[in-house]
């Protein structure tokens, strides 16, 4: 079991498979110049599967989410999914992706054992997409969403970040589109994890702003909430249901007290929180020949020291050096 001093138990593992991405979203990465992790520093496929095996069989992990960077850029992804699906007990498996590669991989991922996907899409307007991502790939994302739905990677969830002056007027339009295509839309407040360290709280679109915008077109009814942890979105029935929309207020209404996550970076570091300054090296233990029991002990010790909260409201808060692309969302 991965328990911390506040009694929280981690059952949800986020595994970053790469820090590389084929988009350059303005709230995540610079257009040029980001230093990639060196290939020898990255965990290989066997190391990733071994760590997931330890997490599932010895530490109580029930769900594994593959992230990046962009996880579809990982050459061995389908094989990793297939091997994790063969574990006993078998964890639930999901993937967070920009969707560009889903058209060619969705069916194979489903056959390998992937359960569902979350796809990032911030706008329905190709010109705004190009401005936000610095790439002209909007059509590829839309086609990837269709492929995921057709392959049965459902429910397909769409994650959207609204940025002032770019797409902050699109919330109702995005929700109408998601309802039409039977996707579950979730709006996420922009977090201080950009590589440029340019985030400012007073410049972000808040959960309150998003809900106000949505209510100009839809009737929203709060859905009965269970604990916010691996499912942190506050969910709202749209026009009485059955469709729902989620809002993840990581900044203005954080859910740290119910957090059930542990994170593994592409270079084998355990992180207790997206915003943590500290990391614990599992790669060194792996490569020095440590047995599974020792790796599990190191992991437990790392999670035991997890802080009470992210500290975004603390005047002394310092953004972590790693950007989101190198942590894994």
Question: Where do the model's predicted regions map?
Answer:
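A short acidic, helix-capping loop that chelates divalent metal ions and anchors anionic groups
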Residues: 33-38, 103, 125-132, 194-198, ...
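Radical SAM/AdoMet-radical enzyme domain recognition
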Residues: 42, 48-65, 70, 74-188
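Glycine-centered loop/turn positions within well-structured domains
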Residues: 23, 126-127, 254, 280
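Auxiliary Fe-S-binding modules of radical SAM enzymes
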Residues: 1-13, 176-180, 187-329
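Short, small-residue-rich loop/turn micro-motifs
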Residues: 19-21, 29-32, 121-123, 189, ...
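A short, compositionally biased micro-patch
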Residues: 18-20, 112, 265
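Canonical Radical SAM [4Fe-4S] cluster-binding loop centered on the CxxxCxxC motif
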Residues: 5-46
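Residues that scaffold the ATP/ADP-binding catalytic core of kinase and kinase-like folds
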Residues: 24, 28, 74, 127, ...
């Amino acid at each position: 079991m991965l328990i911390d001093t506040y009694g929280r138990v981690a059952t949800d593992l986020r595994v970053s498979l790469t820090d590389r991405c084929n988009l350059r979203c303005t709230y995540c990465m610079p257009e040029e110049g980001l230093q990639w992790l060196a290939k020898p520093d990255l965990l290989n496929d066997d190391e990733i599967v071994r760590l997931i095996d330890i997490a599932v069989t010895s530490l109580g992990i029930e769900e594994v989410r593959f992230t990046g960077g962009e996880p579809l850029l990982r050459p061995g992804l389908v094989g990793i999914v297939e091997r994790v699906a063969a574990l006993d007990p078998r964890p639930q498996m999901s993937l967070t992706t920009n969707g560009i590669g889903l058209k060619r991989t969705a069916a194979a991922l489903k056959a390998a054992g992937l359960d569902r996907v979350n796809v990032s899409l911030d706008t329905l307007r190709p010109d705004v997409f190009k401005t936000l991502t610095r790439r002209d790939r909007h059509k590829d994302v839309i086609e990837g969403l269709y492929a995921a739905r057709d392959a049965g990677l459902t429910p397909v969830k769409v994650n959207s970040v609204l940025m002032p002056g770019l797409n902050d007027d699109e919330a109702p339009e995005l929700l109408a589109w998601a309802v039409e295509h039977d996707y579950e839309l979730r709006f996420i407040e922009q977090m201080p994890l950009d590589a440029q360290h340019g985030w400012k709280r007073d410049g972000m679109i808040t959960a309150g702003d998003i809900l106000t915008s949505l209510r100009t077109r839809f009737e929203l009814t709060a859905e009965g909430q269970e604990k916010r942890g691996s499912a942190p979105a506050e969910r709202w029935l749209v026009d009485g249901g059955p469709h729902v929309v989620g809002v993840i207020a990581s900044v203005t209404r954080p859910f740290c007290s119910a957090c059930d996550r542990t994170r593994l970076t592409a270079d084998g570091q355990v992180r207790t929180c997206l915003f943590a300054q500290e990391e614990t090296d599992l790669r060194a233990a792996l490569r020095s020949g440590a047995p599974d029991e020792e790796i599990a002990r190191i992991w437990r010790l790392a999670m035991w020291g997890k802080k009470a909260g992210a500290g975004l409201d603390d005047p002394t808060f310092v953004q972590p050096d790693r950007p989101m692309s190198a942590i894994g969302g």
